[in-house]
Curated annotation (Swiss-Prot):
One of its GO terms (biological process) is DNA recombination. It comes from Nitrosomonas eutropha (strain DSM 101675 / C91 / Nm57). Pfam families: RecA, RecA_C. This is Protein RecA. Keywords: ATP-binding, Cytoplasm, DNA damage, DNA recombination, DNA repair, DNA-binding, Nucleotide-binding, SOS response. Its main location: cytoplasm. Gene3D superfamilies: P-loop containing nucleotide triphosphate hydrolases. One of its GO terms (molecular function) is single-stranded DNA binding. Can catalyze the hydrolysis of ATP in the presence of single-stranded DNA, the ATP-dependent uptake of single-stranded DNA by duplex DNA, and the ATP-dependent hybridization of homologous single-stranded DNAs. It interacts with LexA causing its activation and leading to its autocatalytic cleavage. The keyword Cell wall biogenesis/degradation does not apply. The gene is recA. One of its GO terms (cellular component) is cytosol.
Length: 343
């Protein structure tokens, strides 16, 4: 670039920064832009790996969808618990009016510090979300769920009265407002969504999510969560086998998937993942029913090894860090500390 053009560009950039604030425009190669993406762990080691960056990105919109009882709310509560461990503030917009505080507490959420709102309609829910995001003091906001964001006009209208596209228009308008503030304040906003069936689809996938197409475009990450089986101890069912597919990912290669166990009353079983991934990467040796680490036996049968790792948390952490090193994934704790409101 010649000198005159360079001077003109420098003056234009200075004027833009003066008028709209520092950081309103910058070169992509600047250190502030090119630094590692800040993330928060999902609570699942295999899902952190599948996401490619070690967790869910900060300052982005995330969509988690799946059938009923597939683990959508459990996964988001696990993310909230991980954020709270880092000293972050979390808010839960309970549009379904179905949050169980006791269950949330069991899987590690500090319910005393959790902000909760049970709005009367969709407009109120999204206005509250926008105000929390703009405050810059909340690190994660979860909306449960898009399907329950009923527009005010629909609530006030007659039962059975057609209300074409109201919810889709509401979501589209709200996401246009939210996006810039979410990025500026580095807030993670997670929308939980439900699945519906398209009528008359002969070929292809008949499934679709509620709330129109806007969320599909604005979301940086979309996760499809499904229950794939049951976990039994004897005759008793104690949990679900769960599979999450990364359907969309703007921060790493998409289309990867993660399999993990959700245990009733406990949430995602981190120890089960460490066993499975440890064996896969030859960090844990398996001979028959016995499992060994560094030549020492750590248990017979998965359940016993899981209990052993629960009791020996330092050992579990050591194996986890070796797994992260094996898949070239940095320890997320270095990149997940929430910024202070002044930053």
């Amino acid at each position: 670039m010649d000198e005159n053009k360079n001077k003109a560009l420098t003056a234009a950039l200075a004027q833009i920064e003066k008028q709209y604030g520092k950081g309103s425009i910058m070169r992509l190669g600047d250190s502030d832009v090119a630094k590692d993406i800040q993330v928060v762990s999902t609570g699942s080691l295999s899902l952190d790996i599948a996401l490619g960056v070690g967790g869910l990105p900060r300052g982005r919109i995330i969509e988690i969808y799946g059938p009923e009882s597939s683990g959508k709310t459990t996964l988001t509560l696990q993310v909230i618990a991980e954020m709270q461990k880092l000293g972050g503030t979390a808010a839960f917009i309970d549009a379904e009016h179905a949050l169980d505080p006791q269950y949330a507490q069991k899987i590690g959420v500090n319910v005393q510090e959790l902000l909760i709102s049970q709005p009367d309609n969709g407009e109120q829910a999204l206005e509250i979300t926008d105000m929390l995001v703009r405050s810059g003091s909340v690190d994660i906001v979860v909306i449960d769920s898009v399907a329950a964001l009923t527009p005010r006009a629909e609530i006030e209208g007659e039962m059975g009265e057609p209300q074409m596209g109201l919810q889709a228009r509401l979501m589209s308008q709200a996401l246009r407002k939210l996006t810039a503030n979410i990025k500026r304040t580095n807030t993670t906003v997670i929308f939980i969504n439900q699945i519906r069936m398209k009528i008359g689809v002969m070929f292809g996938n008949p499934e679709t999510t509620t709330g129109g197409n806007a969320l599909k475009f604005y979301a940086s990450v979309r996760l499809d969560i499904r229950r794939t089986g049951s976990i039994k101890r004897g005759e008793e069912i104690v949990g679900n086998e769960t599979r999450v597919k990364v359907v969309k990912n703007k921060v790493a290669p998409p289309f990867k998937q993660a399999d993990f166990a959700i245990l009733y009353g406990e949430g995602i079983s981190r120890e089960s993942e460490i066993i499975e991934l440890g064996v896969l990467h030859k960090l844990i040796e398996k001979a028959g029913a016995w499992y060994s680490y560094n030549g020492e036996k750590i248990g017979q049968g998965r359940d016993n090894v899981r209990d052993y790792l629960k009791e020996h948390k330092d050992l579990a952490h050591e194996i986890e860090q070796k797994i992260r090193a094996a898949v070239d994934l940095a320890e997320t704790n270095n990149r997940t500390v929430p910024p202070s409101p002044s930053e």
